[in-house]
């Protein structure tokens, strides 16, 4: 009888054991949507909103009273720790890519009028030359919590790296709470740690198939193991010239002119999302052959290209061990 009671008690404990469950929170931030899945019952929506508010106040060029807007107006201002992290990372990637990644090119991008009919309108070369005088992150220095610009017209825009940084901030928030299983996604930029406790498997994320008609579908699903992934596409924001050549919104940081490209999508896997985000942007402008050469000295970066060949057919290329599934 005693043995029967013990067996029944053990069976009762197993039957009462909670099934693994994730918490999923969604919302809007940085002009896009976000989705966060994590292994905890606690709702952190308010904490996320507070973190996003602080990041926007620091680096949003859409907010007139943000720190970066004040710096772009040449107002004396002390930057915060978020700005320091992103600025220093931008400096390093600017150096590594020999200026291809440059957060000061935004004014030139904005100056190009692509026109409502999808045709690249002419832009006076003198205006481009004038704008290019203020381009170059090497013209901007950080002195502790002060930003110093050699040219007062230099316009700083962290749009190509800040979204990935926001992903990392949420991830680090979880790790401070000892939450080790999570997936953070903001506008397609992703950071994954641990596993999906519901499925008891690695986090699966999709690589989107390019469509020029704005439809969405997944080309393939891959597993992320304590990594981050960012994707930069050229197939949604492009215009054509009079000869039918397609141009994306990529501006050559050396010339100030848009570049013709056959690249459609570039996905980069790195240890943190800020790094992946910045390199995905840079690799759009570098092109496949230059990226191949670059990756020889950067084994920490995994890259996946989707591009058009000479027959206007889609092709893919995986580099540095980008996962197949």
Model-inferred region functions:
Residues 1-24:
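Bacterial Sec-dependent N-terminal signal peptides
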Residues 16-325:
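Mature catalytic core of soluble alpha/beta enzymes
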């Amino acid at each position: 009888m005693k043995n029967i009671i013990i067996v029944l008690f053990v069976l009762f404990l197993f039957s009462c054991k909670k099934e693994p469950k994730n918490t999923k929170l969604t919302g809007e931030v940085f002009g896009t949507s976000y989705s966060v899945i994590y292994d905890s019952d606690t709702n952190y929506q308010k904490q996320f909103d507070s973190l996003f508010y602080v990041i926007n106040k620091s680096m949003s060029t859409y907010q007139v009273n943000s720190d970066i807007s004040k710096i772009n107006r040449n107002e004396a201002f002390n930057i915060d720790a978020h700005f320091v992290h992103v600025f220093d990372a931008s400096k390093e990637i600017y150096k590594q890519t020999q200026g291809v990644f440059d957060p000061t090119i935004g004014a030139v991008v904005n100056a190009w009028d692509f026109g409502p009919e999808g045709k690249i309108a002419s832009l006076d070369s003198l205006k481009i030359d004038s704008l290019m005088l203020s381009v170059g992150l090497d013209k901007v220095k950080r002195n502790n919590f002060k930003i110093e610009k050699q040219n007062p017209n230099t316009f700083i825009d962290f749009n190509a790296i800040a979204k990935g940084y926001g992903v990392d901030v949420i991830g680090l928030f979880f790790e401070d709470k000892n939450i080790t299983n999570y997936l953070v996604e903001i506008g397609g930029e992703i950071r994954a740690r641990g596993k999906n406790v519901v499925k008891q498997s690695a986090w699966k994320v999709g690589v989107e198939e390019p469509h020029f008609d704005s439809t969405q579908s997944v080309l393939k699903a891959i597993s992320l193991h304590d990594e981050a992934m960012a994707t930069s596409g050229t197939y949604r924001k492009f215009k054509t010239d009079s000869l039918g050549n397609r141009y994306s919104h990529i501006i050559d940081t050396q010339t100030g002119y848009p570049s013709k490209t056959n690249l459609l999508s570039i996905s980069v896997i790195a240890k943190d999302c800020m790094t992946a985000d910045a390199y995905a942007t840079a690799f759009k402008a570098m092109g496949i052959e230059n990226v191949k050469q670059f990756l020889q000295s950067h084994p920490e970066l995994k890259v996946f290209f989707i591009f058009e060949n000479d027959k206007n057919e889609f092709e893919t290329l995986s580099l540095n061990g980008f996962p197949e599934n």
